[in-house]
C-alpha cells in the first residue's frame, strides 16, 4: 500500500467561488483528502490563514483580472517556506508571477513540481477587444507561457485531449496528463445514473419534475433553458438569446443564465429585445448550481472557447441534455452524444432549430437526459479524476527521484 502524500495546491485566487479554477481546486482538495492525503491550498483567500497570500496589484492587468472574477497573488518566500514545509510535491494552477516564484522556490529546495494548463490563450485574447485579431497572437501566447513558466515543469495536467493536442502542436515537450476536472457528487439527476442504461422504456417514471421531463408547450408550463458561464465575449450568450428570439416556441421558454461579467448590461438589453418572457441572469453560488440545473429542461452551452466546460458536465450529471456550440477552440463539443446536441458556434438559426426540436420531442429529451447522466457518471466523476491526478503526482515524484519520465494520457 502506498503512503499518503502531502500535496500543496498553488492557486492565485481562492476567494471567489464564481471562479472555475478556484472551484476545481477546492473539489480536488476535498477528494484527495478523502483518499487519505494531506492537501494545502495556497493563495489569496486560502481557507487556512497561514497559507493565505496577499493580492498583487498590477497596473491594467489587475483591472482585467477583476473583470474575470479573479486576482493575482503576491509571491512571498516566507509563505512558500511555511506552505511547502515537508510537502511531497507542489501543483501550480496558473502560470503567473505567483506560480512562477512558487515553482522556482520548490525546485531550488528539491521539491517536485507539477502544473495545470487551465488558462486558454483565447480567454485572454477575447478580453483585448479588436487586438485579438492580431495574426499569430494565440501562438505567441502559447510560446510565451512555455518559456516563462511551463518549460521547467516535466509533468502538466491538461483537462482535455483537445488542449493536449494544441500543446503538442506548439512544441510543448512535457509529459501531458489528460485528466478531466470532473464534477462533484452533489450534481445528480435524482435517480441512480448507473441505472440509466435501458431506462428508455421507463419514460413515465417519476411524477415530480426532473431534468429532461418537459411537458409539451400546450400545457402552459414554461420550458426552462439553463446556461452557465462568465458573461464574456467568448462565452457567446448573445447567440443563445438571439436563438430563443427566433424559436417557434419563444413564448414558452424561460431563460436562466448563471454567471457574472462585463457583458451583463448588454445581455439584459438583448433579452428585453428578443425574449417573450423575462430572463434570469446573475451570480449563483456554486452550492446552488445542482438545484439550478435540476429545475431546468435543457442546457445550452454557446461558448466559442473552452478548455473543458465543467458546467456542461455538471448539467449532464443532473440529467440535462446539453446543446453545445461546435468550435475548434472548445472541447465541450466532445461531450455531445447525438447530433441534436451540437450547433455551429455563433449560428443562432441552427441553435433555434435544435431548441425547437427538443421542445417538440419530450420523450427523446427524457431518454437522452438519462443517457447523458449515465455517461457523465461513468467517465467524469470527481473520484476517478482525483485518482488519476494522484497517479500523476506519484509519477512526477518518481521522476524527480531519477526513475525517468513517463508519458500519461
What is each of the regions a protein language model found here?
Residues 198-202, 208-209, 215-245, 256:
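Conserved donor-binding/catalytic core segment of Leloir-type glycosyltransferases
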Residues 265-284:
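Nucleotide-activated donor-binding/catalytic signature segment of Leloir-type glycosyltransferases, i.e.
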Residues 43, 136-205, 209-211:
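Donor nucleotide-sugar binding/catalytic pocket of nucleotide-sugar-dependent glycosyltransferases
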Residues 360-395:
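A charged, aromatic-enriched C-terminal amphipathic alpha-helix characteristic of glycosyltransferases
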Residues 84, 150, 283-284, 291-296:
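Short alpha-helical donor nucleotide-sugar binding micro-motif in glycosyltransferases
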Residues 321-325:
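Short hydrophobic beta-strand element within catalytic cores of glycosyltransferases
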Residues 337-349, 357-362:
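Conserved acidic donor-binding segment of nucleotide-sugar-dependent glycosyltransferases
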Residues 95, 304:
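Aromatic "clamp/platform" in nucleotide-sugar-dependent glycosyltransferases that forms part
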Amino acid at each position: 500500500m502506498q503512503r499518503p502524500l502531502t500535496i500543496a495546491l498553488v492557486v492565485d485566487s481562492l476567494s471567489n467561488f464564481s471562479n472555475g479554477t478556484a472551484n476545481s481546486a477546492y473539489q480536488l482538495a476535498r477528494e484527495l483528502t478523502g483518499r487519505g492525503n494531506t492537501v494545502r491550498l495556497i493563495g489569496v483567500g486560502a481557507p487556512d490563514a497561514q497559507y493565505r497570500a496577499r493580492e498583487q496589484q498590477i497596473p491594467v492587468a489587475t483591472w482585467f483580472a477583476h473583470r474575470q472574477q479573479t486576482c493575482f497573488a503576491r509571491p512571498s518566500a516566507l509563505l512558500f517556506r511555511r506552505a511547502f514545509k515537508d510537502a511531497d510535491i507542489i501543483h501550480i494552477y496558473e502560470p503567473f508571477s505567483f506560480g512562477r516564484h512558487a515553482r522556482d522556490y520548490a525546485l531550488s529546495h528539491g521539491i517536485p513540481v507539477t502544473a495545470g494548463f487551465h488558462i486558454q490563450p483565447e480567454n485572454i485574447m477575447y478580453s483585448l477587444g479588436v487586438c485579438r485579431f492580431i495574426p499569430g497572437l494565440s501562438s505567441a501566447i502559447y510560446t510565451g507561457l512555455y518559456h516563462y513558466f511551463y518549460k521547467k515543469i516535466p509533468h502538466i495536467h491538461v483537462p482535455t485531449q483537445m488542449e493536449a493536442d494544441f500543446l503538442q502542436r506548439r512544441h510543448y515537450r512535457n509529459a501531458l496528463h489528460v485528466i478531466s476536472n470532473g464534477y462533484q457528487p452533489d450534481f445528480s439527476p435524482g435517480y441512480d445514473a448507473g441505472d440509466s442504461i435501458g431506462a428508455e422504456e421507463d419514460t413515465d417514471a417519476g411524477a415530480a419534475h426532473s431534468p429532461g421531463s418537459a411537458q409539451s408547450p400546450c400545457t402552459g408550463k414554461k420550458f426552462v433553458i439553463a446556461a452557465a458561464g462568465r458573461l464574456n465575449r467568448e462565452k457567446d450568450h448573445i447567440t443563445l438569446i438571439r436563438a430563443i428570439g427566433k424559436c417557434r416556441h419563444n413564448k414558452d421558454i424561460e431563460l436562466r443564465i448563471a454567471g457574472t461579467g462585463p457583458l451583463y448590461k448588454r445581455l439584459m438589453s438583448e433579452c428585453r429585445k428578443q425574449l417573450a418572457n423575462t430572463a434570469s441572469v446573475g451570480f449563483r453560488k456554486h452550492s446552488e448550481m445542482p438545484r439550478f440545473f435540476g429545475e431546468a429542461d435543457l442546457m445550452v452551452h454557446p461558448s466559442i472557447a473552452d478548455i473543458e466546460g465543467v458546467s456542461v458536465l455538471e448539467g449532464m450529471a443532473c440529467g440535462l441534455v446539453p446543446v453545445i456550440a461546435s468550435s475548434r477552440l472548445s472541447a465541450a463539443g466532445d461531450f455531445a452524444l447525438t447530433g441534436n446536441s451540437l450547433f455551429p458556434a455563433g449560428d443562432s438559426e441552427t441553435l433555434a432549430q435544435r431548441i425547437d426540436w427538443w421542445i417538440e420531442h419530450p420523450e427523446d429529451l427524457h431518454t437522452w437526459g438519462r443517457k447523458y447522466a449515465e455517461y457523465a457518471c461513468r467517465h467524469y466523476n470527481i473520484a476517478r479524476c482525483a485518482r488519476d491526478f494522484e497517479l500523476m503526482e506519484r509519477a512526477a515524484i518518481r521522476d524527480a527521484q531519477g526513475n525517468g519520465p513517463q508519458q500519461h494520457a
